[in-house]
């Protein structure tokens, strides 16, 4: 069934059922981490851009933080540069960082800005380097219980929320590439999940949405019946050591956001067309909701 095949009455019912969520979210900030299939499949890319325009025109303030891992990997391959991952994070040498800056802001960010702006003059692309939006601090990762260096990879030490609030007040949609200098001006690549959580906390967001390529959070992946629809932070912390490496940054981001005061974080299925609207405006949703213990 598509929207075209619904009766007029059914369409009206769908819209009416969204009213409680529209009222809850009106005037509020929603931070969305955009990544996975949603940014490589053309139909999903178009749907995501339309969702952002929809939120903006409903009086909701979306702030988009995008990844770009597959695109960075592809460009590294074209340039003959070897890449590596440790603990779910890309090892970032100065050479890899140059490629990441080029791809994240010059390619991925531009494409998303243009897709959103096909609906109106809404989106503005920025990086953590602009207006001192982010200050980074170098981080390591835990691999088999050992702190391991991963190069020019940072965590968010500080967020200059005022830099984004100016854009939000002007009814723009910030589209953020996660590159930021440390206190000495050395630029670091920040994991987009990590950056999205820090932004959600600093902006006092109502929700943090994390787009993934799975249906949500599984307690015993790949057992399909272990999918969790809602989990609190205490249970999630217990689960963290058993998760696959690629899911760890996303779960850490949800924990950081909710612990920092964001009412809920959501790990949602980015393979579902209009997944953002499905999660925000329907009872069923399309993923796992994380709430405070």
Curated annotation (Swiss-Prot):
InterPro entries: AceGlu_kinase-like_sf, AcgluKinase_fam, ArgB, Asp/Glu/Uridylate_kinase, Glu/AcGlu_kinase, NAGK-C. One of its GO terms (biological process) is arginine biosynthetic process via ornithine. Disulfide bonds: none annotated. Its EC number is 2.7.2.8. CDD domains: AAK_NAGK-C. Pathway: Amino-acid biosynthesis; L-arginine biosynthesis; N(2)-acetyl-L-ornithine from L-glutamate: step 2/4. It catalyses: N-acetyl-L-glutamate + ATP = N-acetyl-L-glutamyl 5-phosphate + ADP. Substrate binds at residues 68-69, 90, 189. It is found in: Cytoplasm. GO terms for molecular function: acetylglutamate kinase activity; ATP binding. One of its GO terms (cellular component) is cytoplasm. The record marks 33, 250 as: Transition state stabilizer. Gene3D superfamilies: Acetylglutamate kinase-like. It is an enzyme of class 2 (transferase). Keywords: Amino-acid biosynthesis, Arginine biosynthesis, ATP-binding, Cytoplasm, Kinase, Nucleotide-binding, Transferase. Its main location: cytoplasm. Transmembrane segments: none annotated. Catalyzes the ATP-dependent phosphorylation of N-acetyl-L-glutamate. Belongs to the acetylglutamate kinase family. ArgB subfamily. PANTHER family: N-ACETYLGLUTAMATE SYNTHASE (PTHR23342), N-ACETYLGLUTAMATE SYNTHASE, MITOCHONDRIAL (PTHR23342:SF0). HAMAP family: ArgB (MF_00082). This is Acetylglutamate kinase. It comes from Mycobacterium marinum (strain ATCC BAA-535 / M).
